[in-house]
């Protein structure tokens, strides 16, 4: 069989994961979001009431800017060259994460391949969904959902987002 959680054995008491055969586990789909949340937790513990934390494009906010206005963030238009704003959102005690392959891909023999791997096939995703942005209460959740939605493709992702009332 191919990749998948069914090939792993989780031992919570030992904080261990075992596998009968070599497996590659990539946590990059939540790593930046986790880092943002860790910094936000620290700022909360220090009594900082208003902040914007950003790591590699993943963001979490709390409170308002010093001038009293909401934190406003641009969502980029997914274009390979240059930068352009697609839309602007105001966040208050929320997180936002984006996943996409419009800049992070590789080419081989004239074929373009996404850096995102489909867990069902073990191969790069094959659809042309360029970018997904998700807003959630915490950044690790937003990061994981954005990556998952990117893997799913537009129709499945929007169906799930609509059913679960997830801003995407």
Predicted regions mapped to residue ranges:
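Mature catalytic core of soluble alpha/beta enzymes
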Residues: 1-168
């Amino acid at each position: 069989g191919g990749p998948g959680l069914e090939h792993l054995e989780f031992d919570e008491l030992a904080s261990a994961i075992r596998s009968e055969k070599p497996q590659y586990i990539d946590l990059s789909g939540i790593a930046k979001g986790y880092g943002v949340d860790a910094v936000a937790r620290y700022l909360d513990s220090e009594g900082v009431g208003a902040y914007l934390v950003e790591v590699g494009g993943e963001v979490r906010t709390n409170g308002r800017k010093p001038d009293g206005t909401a934190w406003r963030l641009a969502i980029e238009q997914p274009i390979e060259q240059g930068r352009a704003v697609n839309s602007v959102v105001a966040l208050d005690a929320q997180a936002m994460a984006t996943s996409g392959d419009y800049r992070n891909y590789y080419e081989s023999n004239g074929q373009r391949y996404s850096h995102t791997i489909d867990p069902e096939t073990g191969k790069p995703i094959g659809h042309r969904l360029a970018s997904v942005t998700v807003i959630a209460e915490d950044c690790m959740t937003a990061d994981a959902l954005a990556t998952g939605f990117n893997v799913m493709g537009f129709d499945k992702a929007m169906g799930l987002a609509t059913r679960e009332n997830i801003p995407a």
